C-alpha cells in the first residue's frame, strides 16, 4: 500500500511549514510502498534522517533528493514500484531506491532497478538503514550539529497517531514454494526482547492505543537465538512469542491500549496464546496464513499439510476463546490444483467459518520454485476460482457479522466527520478488515474523537462492515 508520495513526516502537519523553519536544511522526499513491514523500514529511515537534521519534503520539487522504498513480491507490486521510481526521476531527478525490489535480479542476474532505471543514484535491499543513510550522505551531505533530541523516543511514524506497527523480527526460515521473501530479506533475525519492549513502551507513552505486532513469521520469534532469556525492567523475559505476547499485554493494560498479532504461522505453540486472548491480555484476533486446505496442494506449496488437524485446532481455539476472530489468506489456482482440490478448499472455508479472509489468484513470482511445478492453470481459471472462493467466504463473513447486531462492542475511532465516526472493533485490523460506522452523537456526553475508544451498540451489518451508535 503506497503512502503519499513523497511522504511527509506524520509529526509535521504542514511540510512547507517545517521546511520554512529550517531553509538551510537539506530536504529528502520519501515514497513508501508495500506491506506494514516495509512501512516500519520507512519509519526507521525517516526517523534517522530527522535525527541527523534532514528535513522531510512534502513535494518532489521541494526535495534535494527522493528515497523510494519499494515492494517486489508480486508482478503488480514490481510494476508499481518501477513506475514510482520513474515518476520520482522525472519529477526530481535524484533518486535512491531501497526495499524488496532493490534485492531482485532478472533472469540474467542483473539488478532489475538499475536495468530499468540506470539513472538512480543507489540501490539497496530491504531493512538496509545503514546503506540508505550512506547513500544519502554521499549525494546529500548531512548538516552539522543536528538536534537529535528533537526526534521523539517513539521515532517518527507514518501511521495515524493512535496506532503503530511493532516489528519484532526480520526475515523468514521457511521456504514456501510460492514465496521469495527469504531471498530478499534473509533468514529469521529476532530483535532483542528488551529492545522490543522498550519500543512498545515508548509508543504507548506517545499515545498509541493499538499496537500491531508484525514480522515475516511472528510465531518463530526467538528461534534463531534459541529463545535466549533477556531482561525487561529487572525481570527475566524469554525471547519467545508466548512470553513476549504476555509481557506486551501486561504493558498495554497499563495504558488502556490494544495489542494485535499478525503473521502468526500455525506452529503448535500458537495454542499457548489463545488463553491470553481469552483473559484479555491481547486482542482475541489471530492472523494465521493457511494458504490452502488440500494436503497435496499444501505439500506443493511446502506448507504444513494437515487440514484435519487445523480444523480441530480452530474448534479448540474457539472453545477456549469464544470471541476469537480468525483472519487468514489463501491462494486459488496454484499450479496443479485440480477442481477436486479446490472444492476441498471451499468446503474447508464453509466449515471453518473464518471471520476474515483474503484470497489471491496464483501469480507466478520471478525466482519462486513454484514456477517450475507442472500443471500451471490459465489466468481465467485462476481468477474464476478466486471469485468462487470469495463468494463462499463473504457469505460466511456476512453470517458471522449478522450475529453481532444488538451487541455492544468496544470500538477504536479512526476518523470523525460530518456523517459521524469510522472505527474498528477488536475484530478489525486497519486497512485489511472491516469498519464500524458510528452514527453522529445525539448528546454532548456522547461525543467522540479520533484515537478514542467508545462503546458502540451494533444496529446493522453487511458482508464486511458494521453500523452502530454510541
From Swiss-Prot:
It comes from Cupriavidus taiwanensis (strain DSM 17343 / BCRC 17206 / CCUG 44338 / CIP 107171 / LMG 19424 / R1). InterPro entries: Elp3/MiaA/NifB-like_rSAM, Methylthiotransferase, Methylthiotransferase_CS, Methylthiotransferase_N, Methylthiotransferase_N_sf, NA-bd_OB-fold, Ribosomal_uS12_MeSTrfase_RimO, rSAM. It catalyses: L-aspartate(89)-[ribosomal protein uS12]-hydrogen + (sulfur carrier)-SH + AH2 + 2 S-adenosyl-L-methionine = 3-methylsulfanyl-L-aspartate(89)-[ribosomal protein uS12]-hydrogen + (sulfur carrier)-H + 5'-deoxyadenosine + L-methionine + A + S-adenosyl-L-homocysteine + 2 H(+). Residues 402-470 form the TRAM domain. The keyword Cytoplasm applies. This is Ribosomal protein uS12 methylthiotransferase RimO. Its cofactor is [4Fe-4S] cluster. Catalyzes the methylthiolation of an aspartic acid residue of ribosomal protein uS12. Transmembrane segments: none annotated. Residues 7-19 have a biased composition (Polar residues). Residues 1-27 are annotated as: Disordered. GO terms for molecular function: 4 iron, 4 sulfur cluster binding; aspartic acid methylthiotransferase activity; metal ion binding; protein methylthiotransferase activity. Disulfide bonds: none annotated. The gene is rimO. It is an enzyme of class 2 (transferase). Belongs to the methylthiotransferase family. RimO subfamily. [4Fe-4S] cluster 2 binds at residues 172, 176, 179. One of its GO terms (cellular component) is cytosol. Signal peptide: none annotated. Keywords: 4Fe-4S, Cytoplasm, Iron, Iron-sulfur, Metal-binding, S-adenosyl-L-methionine, Transferase.
